[in-house]
């Protein structure tokens, strides 16, 4: 019940949602297309890095987070997903949210990994100038994400 309540109370109220609709009535197509392009590139990068390192994860189809599952890789090392998150943060400085915060069994090592730690304005301005973005662009415009994913993988494989 607590998980459901937190999701209900942390949502925007109806008046705020209506205000957002009015704010977005102008043509936001260019902004949305480039935002999607950036988030698709980052999501694909995170997915590939985790998947090629034997970490179970579904390919993102939108949004700005993925839910990696470390259960097969590290299940015998941690009592709960919350314990895993604490140790990961202490040892690497990388923060994940435990799956138990989203209704998953606390013993399952499932997490929410958000990939939005980058300067969106700079990345968008660069994206407006490019037809295509590349993995190399992530090193320039999303270096914390690249570094964070690498830290997670190195830590999990030690």
Protein language model annotation of sequence segments:
Residues 1-158:
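PLP-dependent class I/II
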């Amino acid at each position: 019940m607590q998980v459901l309540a937190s999701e209900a109370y942390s949502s925007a109220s109806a008046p705020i949602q209506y205000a957002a609709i009015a704010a977005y009535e102008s043509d936001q197509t260019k902004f949305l297309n480039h935002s999607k392009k950036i988030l698709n590139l980052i999501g694909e990068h995170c997915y590939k890095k985790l998947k090629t390192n034997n970490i179970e994860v579904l390919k993102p189809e939108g949004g700005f987070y993925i839910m990696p599952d470390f259960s097969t890789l590290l299940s015998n090392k941690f009592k709960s997903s919350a314990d895993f998150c604490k140790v990961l943060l202490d040892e690497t400085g990388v923060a994940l949210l435990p799956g138990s915060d989203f209704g998953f069994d606390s013993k399952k090592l499932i997490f929410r990994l958000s990939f939005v730690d980058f300067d969106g304005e700079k990345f968008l301005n660069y994206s407006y100038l490019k037809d295509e973005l590349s993995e190399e662009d992530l090193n320039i415009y999303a270096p914390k994400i690249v570094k964070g994913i690498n830290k997670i993988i190195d830590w999990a494989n030690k």
